[in-house]
Amino acid sequence: MKLVDAYVFLEELGSLLYKLLEQRDKLREEGYPVPGREVATPLVKYGFVSMLKGGVIMDVTNPEQAIIAEEAGAVGVMVLDKLPYDVRMAGGVARTADVKVIEEVMSSITIPVSAKCRIGHEFEARVLEEVGVDLIDESEVLTPVDEKAHINKWLFKTPFVNGARSLPEALRRIYEGASMIRTKGEPGTGNVAEAVKHIKIVNRDIYMLNGYYRNGDVEAIWVYSKENRVPYELALLTARLGRLPVVNFAAGGIATPADAALMMWLGADGVFVGSGIFKSNDPEARARGIVLATTYWDDPETVLEAQKMVSEKASMLGIDIRRLKPEELMQERGV
């Protein structure tokens, strides 16, 4: 990005943030409950997640896995009670991880520690913030407590990441205070196809909006925002930037170094890897290979080297998404 473009980006982002904060104050004036809690400035939140760009965040369930992730070069870990594949197999209600496990992971490694909360469950999120995690994932992998309303993330000092299958979903989550977006994909399947579909859908709409902006057709951007129930200012900023105004990671079904390189090639800023590493039979080598391929995704020789580090025979057993029932699709949760 050119220096001039960077200044324009920061100016537009600052303007947007002030408007979002004004909206928060308006909600407070209208009587909506807004606890008097310490909040970090949006730029601090965005600054933290920006430092994760180009890296890999790995799902873990214990300190031993977290140590493997750190030694492999991960930029962070995401602590769960069960890996997405096991959540899918176990059924029942999936909740946030055991606080003791999160604390053990935090004391075992030096890289940022994240954790998931259920969609709409403000007090799981508050517990995670009190524990001191660096990033909260309001995740469709866990069982939602509210299918129609997400957490008001402006009330937290900890940055949030949310999943999205489309640009309107992504912009709605950003409007709610998400500092980071990721593709939803279809977690726990070892099949990257849905993540590919989602990032292409997002990219398609961004390309379209950017075309409107370059042609001076702001009315078309306004129509898009109204038809898709997203704030016009966010749609306009996205159109001007030609990308999402926050960091956008890939997630859902990434199981090999080649999968990670593919998502980076499609425009992701980094990747989350869920079950793909620790449901495989070669987690240490696979973790190193995925980090290598993510870092050097634009160098085919290095991606080949990374792919040689893993064995297909050791890969997690994948799930054919076409055989899943509609109620089994996690990506449908919380739109």
Swiss-Prot record:
It holds the Pfam family SOR_SNZ. Gene3D superfamilies: Aldolase class I. The active site is at K116 (schiff-base intermediate with d-ribose 5-phosphate). It catalyses: aldehydo-D-ribose 5-phosphate + D-glyceraldehyde 3-phosphate + L-glutamine = pyridoxal 5'-phosphate + L-glutamate + phosphate + 3 H2O + H(+). GO terms for molecular function: pyridoxal 5'-phosphate synthase (glutamine hydrolysing) activity. One of its GO terms (biological process) is pyridoxine biosynthetic process. InterPro entries: Aldolase_TIM, PdxS/SNZ, PdxS/SNZ_N, RibuloseP-bd_barrel. D-glyceraldehyde 3-phosphate binds at K200. Keywords: Lyase, Pyridoxal phosphate, Schiff base. Pathway: Cofactor biosynthesis; pyridoxal 5'-phosphate biosynthesis. It comes from the Archaea. Its EC number is 4.3.3.6. The keyword Chaperone does not apply. It is an enzyme of class 4 (lyase). D-ribose 5-phosphate binds at D59, G188, G253, G274, S275. PROSITE patterns: PDXS_SNZ_1, PDXS_SNZ_2. Catalyzes the formation of pyridoxal 5'-phosphate from ribose 5-phosphate (RBP), glyceraldehyde 3-phosphate (G3P) and ammonia. The ammonia is provided by the PdxT subunit. Can also use ribulose 5-phosphate and dihydroxyacetone phosphate as substrates, resulting from enzyme-catalyzed isomerization of RBP and G3P, respectively. In the presence of PdxT, forms a dodecamer of heterodimers. Belongs to the PdxS/SNZ family. PANTHER family: PYRIDOXAL 5'-PHOSPHATE SYNTHASE SUBUNIT SNZ1-RELATED. This is Pyridoxal 5'-phosphate synthase subunit PdxS. It comes from Desulfurococcus amylolyticus (strain DSM 18924 / JCM 16383 / VKM B-2413 / 1221n) (Desulfurococcus kamchatkensis). The lineage of its organism: Archaea, Thermoproteota, Thermoprotei, Desulfurococcales, Desulfurococcaceae.
